Amino acid sequence: MQDLISQVEDLAGIEIDHTTSMVMIFGIIFLTAVVVHIILHWVVLRTFEKRAIASSRLWLQIITQNKLFHRLAFTLQGIIVNIQAVFWLQKGTEAADILTTCAQLWIMMYALLSVFSLLDVILNLAQKFPAASQLPLKGIFQGIKLIGAILVGILMISLLIGQSPAILISGLGAMAAVLMLVFKDPILGLVAGIQLSANDMLKLGDWLEMPKYGADGAVIDIGLTTVKVRNWDNTITTIPTWSLVSDSFKNWSGMSASGGRRIKRSISIDVTSIRFLDEDEMQRLNKAHLLKPYLTSRHQEINEWNRQQGSTESVLNLRRMTNIGTFRAYLNEYLRNHPRIRKDMTLMVRQLAPGDNGLPLEIYAFTNTVVWLEYESIQADIFDHIFAIVEEFGLRLHQSPTGNDIRSLAGAFKQ
């Protein structure tokens, strides 16, 4: 550089002092930086953005939205300034040290931001594909960003103080306890995110139920430290990511994948209405298409058993059909012939233990849809029919006395 200044002095016939030469050098570096900035940002990047917006290629639009090339351009500008500082300024001078340090800090910062943009581009592209969109990549990428920011921060500090990064890293060992306390949630969240992804425990869109945190809805975001759940009342519940590994939760995605949703509901039968069927009732019920095969086979089985016993002196020696058993058989056939009930999954009508509320008769079946509205409609239609048909079997539903029951009882006493 000094040779160049000497040649300028000889040609111009003037003497240039040190201050003037430094002003000239910094002016050249500044003008070069401005020209490079104009070329990159006003010409190259604007042209690229216009073509990306007009293009139908998704990856070009995502790159533009995340400003990946903008940050790469700033990184390139820092590299050019650093090269000029090495070329124009004498090594070891204060001006050279200051300018190269600033340029290197600039390069580190924008290189880190460029990596952040690249990760965002990968994440946005992954979310466009069904298979990759189900993975909790956001939390993993946030963890990578955190680690990258810490490493670059160490490099920048070591550059400013003029020490090796190894010295700083070795000094961090004494602060491990403090760092673990400060970065507890991010570290636990990163580990939890990897476990959730590796074990396929949770994906975006899954129906999650976690009563401890009041969460019951669809997962809309899996981050480094938190998981967001949109509840069915449209409220948002935030759950610490690590709690999904340390605590238990219910994931309904298996139900959605199976294509069938369970109906498990019981009705209470008044036990005082349970009795044997007489001949007239059997003949009337035999007209039902769903019951006819059952009544025929059951009647033959009972008659054969009674014939073998040969004793008809007491009802205790005989087998007879009951209204509750016939009703249970009817419900079983009704469900098996229902067009919206899965026949390849568990299907049964069973008695539960009787109690103060009568005899519970439970319907256990699966619908052929997992859509909530359709499921509720199918379930309601089934129980509407059950409530309406129960009296045909001489049975009564059990319920606690209502105001109407009390008024009827009071009217009976008045009479």
Curated annotation (Swiss-Prot):
InterPro entries in alphabetical order: LSM_dom_sf, MS_channel_C, MscS_beta-dom_sf, MscS_channel_2nd, MscS_channel_C_sf, YbdG
Q: How does it sit in the membrane?
A: Multi-pass membrane protein
Periplasmic face residues: 1-24, 89-104, 170-173
Q: Provide one Gene Ontology biological process annotation.
A: response to osmotic stress
Q: What happens when the gene is disrupted?
A: The deletion mutant still exhibits an occasional MscM-like conductance. The null mutant is not sensitive to hyperosmotic shock.
- Mark the transmembrane ranges: 25-45, 68-88, 105-125, 149-169, 174-194
* Main localization, broad class: membrane
Q: What are the subcellular locations of this protein?
A: Cell inner membrane
- Matching SUPFAM superfamilies: Mechanosensitive channel protein MscS (YggB), C-terminal domain (SSF82689), Sm-like ribonucleoproteins (SSF50182)
- Is Cell inner membrane among this UniProt entry's keywords? yes
**Keyword annotations:** Cell inner membrane, Cell membrane, Membrane, Stress response, Transmembrane, Transmembrane helix
Q: What induces it?
A: Induced by growth at high osmolarity.
Q: Cite the ranges annotated as topological domain Cytoplasmic.
A: 46-67, 126-148, 195-415
Keyword Membrane assigned: yes
- Record-level Gene Ontology MF annotations: identical protein binding; mechanosensitive monoatomic ion channel activity
Concerning its family, UniProt says: Belongs to the MscS (TC 1.A.23) family.
**What function does the entry list?**
Functions as a component of a mechanosensing system that transmits signals triggered by external osmotic changes to intracellular factors. Probably plays a crucial role in cellular protection against high osmotic pressure. Also confers protection against mild hypoosmotic shock. Overexpression confers protection against severe shocks. Lacks measurable transport activity.
Cite the record's note on assembly.
Homoheptamer. The long C-terminal cytosolic region interacts with intracellular proteins like FbaA and HldD.
The protein depicted here goes by the name Mechanosensing system component YbdG
